[in-house]
A protein has these predicted regions:
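Aromatic "clamp/platform" in nucleotide-sugar-dependent glycosyltransferases that forms part
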Residues: 206-208
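Nucleotide-activated donor-binding/catalytic signature segment of Leloir-type glycosyltransferases, i.e.
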Residues: 170-188
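Short hydrophobic beta-strand element within catalytic cores of glycosyltransferases
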Residues: 216, 225-228
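Glycosyltransferase donor-sugar binding loop
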Residues: 128-133, 156-170, 186-187
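Short alpha-helical donor nucleotide-sugar binding micro-motif in glycosyltransferases
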Residues: 4, 187-188, 195-200
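Conserved donor-binding/catalytic core segment of Leloir-type glycosyltransferases
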Residues: 111-136, 142-145
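A short, active-site helix/loop in glycosyltransferases that binds the activated sugar's phosphate group
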Residues: 44, 60-111
Length: 307
């Protein structure tokens, strides 16, 4: 509380218990504050465990209250968080993902790779995420591979980059008879991840809790065809036919999407995703963020007179 009393203004990232306490203190001490909404607490808690399901409604309504009454809000999504947690104040969408450089040689290499793909050759699917956090959703892709195998389609390999205990996902792979099609690559330095992205064929973001996924945008910037779950900002990045639901139908939907990826489709999606990723150019995002921050700074100077 003393820290807030001594400051001129507050910038708080929600959801976060500490940030929530800070905003509460700022309101009490009549200090101007800006909120940056980076994720959905409902999704994070509801998809975690039983205790999370109990806490989810409380956290949801708490964040809804604070954002509704925030005079300045930055959202990391274009639509999702804005719809779920609207504000009466001023707002701007500024992704917390910012790509530094684009090189058209990347998309040229991707298109060449797709063109040279042989009929029935191995198709490598990839995901970067912790492998011991169940809401990351890799198990749904593994189950889909099992279903495709029963249909006679065995040319898919799923590579997982990320740290953590692999026991659960390995058990799912074994149960679905696809242990030989699932490869755990472990943690990888960021620069090596880009090299790996250039090797795989399709990227999938199957998680049930997200803000705006950096990993997916980075994959798109390498010209990768991609698909993902109907979670948070993922549908803002991909075309609707490459989104699967978070329901009991999701395994069938993943299978349908994977079967749809022929050469023509992969070429179209490679081009489309590469262009879409350019919206996350660091210079564009930083310009928008700085303009909004300057406006908040001016507002903060005169807050005592207008607050």
């Amino acid at each position: 509380d003393q820290e807030i009393k001594n400051c001129d203004c507050l910038i708080a990232r929600l959801p976060s218990s500490i940030s929530t306490m800070a905003v509460k203190s700022a309101k009490k001490n009549n200090k101007p504050y800006l909120i940056e909404a980076v994720a959905c607490p409902w999704d994070a808690l509801w998809n975690y465990n039983l205790v999370g399901k109990i806490l989810a409604p409380f956290s949801y309504f708490r964040m809804k209250y604070y954002l509704l009454n925030s005079r300045y809000t930055i959202y990391v999504t274009n639509e999702f968080l804005q719809r779920r947690y609207p504000t009466r104040g001023k707002s701007v969408n500024c992704s917390n993902v910012a790509l530094k450089e684009f090189n058209d040689k990347v998309i040229e290499a991707r298109l060449k790779k797709i063109k040279n793909t042989q009929q029935d050759s191995k198709i490598i699917i990839g995901t970067t995420a912790a492998v011991d956090v169940r809401y990351k959703g890799q198990q749904y892709v593994i189950k889909a591979l099992g279903k495709l195998k029963k249909q006679g389609l065995t040319n898919f390999e799923y590579q997982l980059v990320g740290g953590g205990d692999t026991a659960y996902l390995k058990s799912i792979a074994k149960k679905n008879n696809v242990a030989d099609q699932v490869k755990f690559l472990g943690s990888m330095p960021h620069n090596k991840v880009f090299e790996w992205l250039d090797v795989i064929d399709i990227y999938v973001q199957p998680s049930r809790q997200e803000g705006l996924p950096r990993a997916l945008i980075e994959a798109m910037s390498r010209g990768l065809p991609a698909f993902g779950a109907r979670t948070a900002g993922i549908p803002e990045l991909l075309e609707s036919q490459y989104i699967f639901s978070n329901t009991v139908r999701n395994i069938d939907e993943i299978c349908s999407i994977l079967k749809r990826f022929d050469k023509r489709c992969m070429t179209e999606q490679a081009l489309r995703n590469y262009q879409e990723s350019k919206k996350y150019d660091k210079q564009l995002i930083e310009k928008r963020r700085q303009e909004f921050m300057l406006e908040f700074k001016e507002y903060s100077k005169y807050y005592g007179d207008i607050g």
